[in-house]
């Protein structure tokens, strides 16, 4: 294991019994077929549960819906990117030549995904308790806001609650097109409400952002129809 990975283990306060997991967690799909996306998927769930447990403990009076919104605000890309920078992930992430030349080691989405993959790798290497301890240490310096600004509803949440309040099924989201070069893609996403036969589209720099844009467009349509 090289000095960079040894230093990262020290910052994580975890020495891997299977160092290959850490290497894979830091490997972008542009570098190798043995990349970090499955670990990212796993780490996203581990992170979500660990943060949910932290909020349940610290915000004992907050109702479920508000807890969900505080958690979403905490684990958003901006926060994970900041934490990844603090761990020094730009210095150790493995990128393909084209991605590296285009500045991929600075890209917030790549670094946020790598952090989730590292959390997933720690979970596989040592179990949930150790991964949870890592998440708690990472979020020690992150301000946990429970004010109205922090728990403001994003478009997807607002749309979901609008539909549930009318006993309707949740909307369907589909990526209909991926535009641009691999290192700078935009996602064209459809949002459909089947019962109403409504379909709207939105574009964003990630799938999640595209879904939020499509949900915002759908909310505008619903509010316009309601005002008629």
From Swiss-Prot:
Q: Which UniProt keywords apply?
A: Cytoplasm, Endonuclease, Hydrolase, Magnesium, Metal-binding, mRNA processing, Nuclease, RNA-binding, rRNA processing, rRNA-binding, tRNA processing
> Which cysteines are cross-linked by disulfides?
none
- Indicate where this protein is primarily found: cytoplasm
Q: Where, subcellularly, is it found? A: Cytoplasm
Entry GO MF terms: double-stranded RNA binding; metal ion binding; ribonuclease III activity; rRNA binding
Q: Which reaction does it catalyse?
A: Endonucleolytic cleavage to 5'-phosphomonoester
Q: What residues form the catalytic site here?
A: 44, 116
Residues involved in Mg(2+) binding: 40, 113, 116
Q: Where is the DRBM domain?
A: 154-224
Give the InterPro entries listed for this entry.
Answer: dsRBD_dom (IPR014720), RNase_III (IPR011907), RNase_III_dom (IPR000999), RNase_III_sf (IPR036389)
RNase III domain span: 5-127
Q: Which GO terms describe its biological process?
A: mRNA processing; regulation of gene expression; rRNA processing; tRNA processing
Listed cofactors = Mg(2+)
**Which Pfam families does UniProt cross-reference here?**
dsrm, Ribonucleas_3_3
- What enzyme category does the UniProt record give? hydrolase
Stated EC number for the protein is 3.1.26.3
Entry's Gene Ontology cellular component terms: cytoplasm
Key word RNA-binding present:
yes
Q: Self-association or partners: how does it assemble? A: Homodimer.
Annotated HAMAP family = RNase_III
**What does the record give as the function of this protein?**
Digests double-stranded RNA. Involved in the processing of primary rRNA transcript to yield the immediate precursors to the large and small rRNAs (23S and 16S). Processes some mRNAs, and tRNAs when they are encoded in the rRNA operon. Processes pre-crRNA and tracrRNA of type II CRISPR loci if present in the organism.
**What family is reported?**
Belongs to the ribonuclease III family.
Q: What is this protein called?
A: Ribonuclease 3
Per the UniProt record, the source organism is Albidiferax ferrireducens (strain ATCC BAA-621 / DSM 15236 / T118) (Rhodoferax ferrireducens)
């Amino acid at each position: 294991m090289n000095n960079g990975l040894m230093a990262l283990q020290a910052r994580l306060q975890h020495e891997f019994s299977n160092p290959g997991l850490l290497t894979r967690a830091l490997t972008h799909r542009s570098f190798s077929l043995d990349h970090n996306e499955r670990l990212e998927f796993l780490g996203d769930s581990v992170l979500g549960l660990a943060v949910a447990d932290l909020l349940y403990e610290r915000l004992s009076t907050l109702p479920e819906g508000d807890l969900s919104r505080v958690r979403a605000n905490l684990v958003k890309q901006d926060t994970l990117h900041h934490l990844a920078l603090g761990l020094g992930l730009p210095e150790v992430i493995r990128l393909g030549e084209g991605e590296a030349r285009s500045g991929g080691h600075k890209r917030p989405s790549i670094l946020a995904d790598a952090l989730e993959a590292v959390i997933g790798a720690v979970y596989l290497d040592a179990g949930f308790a150790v991964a949870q301890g890592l998440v708690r240490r990472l979020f020690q310096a992150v301000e946990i806001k429970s004010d109205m600004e922090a728990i403001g509803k994003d478009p997807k949440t607002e749309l979901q609650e609008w539909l549930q309040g009318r006993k309707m099924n949740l909307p369907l989201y589909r990526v209909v097109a991926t535009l641009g070069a691999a290192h700078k893609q935009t996602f064209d996403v459809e949002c459909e409400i089947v019962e109403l036969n409504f379909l709207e589209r939105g574009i964003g720099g990630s799938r999640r952002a595209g879904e939020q844009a499509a949900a915002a467009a759908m909310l505008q349509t619903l509010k316009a129809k309601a005002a008629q």
